[in-house]
Amino acid sequence: HKIQTVAVEPAESPVMSGGEAGLHGIQGIGDGSKFLVDLKKVDDIMVISTEDAKSRMKQLIGTGLLVGISSGANVLASERWIEQNDPDGIVVTILCDRGERYLSCM
C-alpha cells in the first residue's frame, strides 16, 4: 500500500480545498492551517462539520478517551476516508488534544 497524507478541515471554513474562510467550532484547525501545510504533500483533504466532529468527540469520550473536537474530526475523517478509498487499508491518525480544554463545549 502507498502511504497517503490526508488533511482535515472544517466544512464551515474549507480554505485548503478552495473554499471561503468562515466561523467554525473545531479549535486548532481551519483557515490559519492553510499556511502551515505544504499542500503539495497532501494527497487528499477531508471536510468535516463542527457538528459531526463534536458528535464523534462525544462518542470517543464515551469509550474512555477524553479528547477534544479536533480529535473527533481526525477520527471521523479517518473513518470516512478508509471507507471511501481503501476499506482493507490501515489508517494512522493523531489525537492532538485533550478534552479538559473543551469541557464547556461538551
Question: Where would I find each of the regions flagged by the language model?
Answer:
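Active-site/ligand-binding loops adjacent to catalytic centers
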Residues: 2-69, 84, 106
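Terminal helix/beta-alpha structural elements that buttress the NAD(P)+-binding lobe
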Residues: 8, 73-81
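Phosphate-binding loop/pocket of nucleotide- and phosphate-handling active sites
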Residues: 35, 79-106
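Ser/Thr-glycine-rich phosphate-binding loops at phosphate-binding pockets of nucleotides
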Residues: 70-74, 91
